């Protein structure tokens, strides 16, 4: 997600085996065929660099929530720093937005999910470079994480530039569906926000049509500039910059949990 559209990996890496013990049998070696399958079928990427491989072994096991155990009632206990609120980013791609938000909001805890090996690798490098203690990572299908998180635990969810699945026969694979909106609403606090950005007009319309019919959310926009302009605290991404260069106009939606 987050506009991450990458090419097939050159093949598996055996040097990652120690780190992969933190994952279940469905997600073994991050560079193996078993894990080259993303949310709804795309988890391909370039081979990891040496530093990323090292961080998969040394840092990632410290950041991964154990989904085989019940989630703590207070997610702040997953972190070693004082926090006021919890947020979720689904499909963080190059991690530019995630890292910028974590730096700007040190008292917010971030759980970030991505099914792409390369996205996890980039995030690990950035977390290590900036010595961030308020991020936890989930490597795999975001639906697993949505089912694990406790009700009303989050203040905000960011879903930025998810795969639009442009072919009509694939629309059922789009992240925004009636069922996924219910699942997102369950884990948001009352008054919490779902923020969604896309550069695909059809996906923007698709999302609005479903959210406006949802009993759980209200669209906060009062004028066109509210969704045509980035949010005041929005950190742009490389994918977004590329979309703008190619003439696509992003839409920025904020939906509030009732």
Roles of regions detected by a PLM:
Residues 93:
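Conserved glycine-rich SAM-binding loop
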Residues 20-88, 96-103, 124-152:
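S-adenosyl-L-methionine
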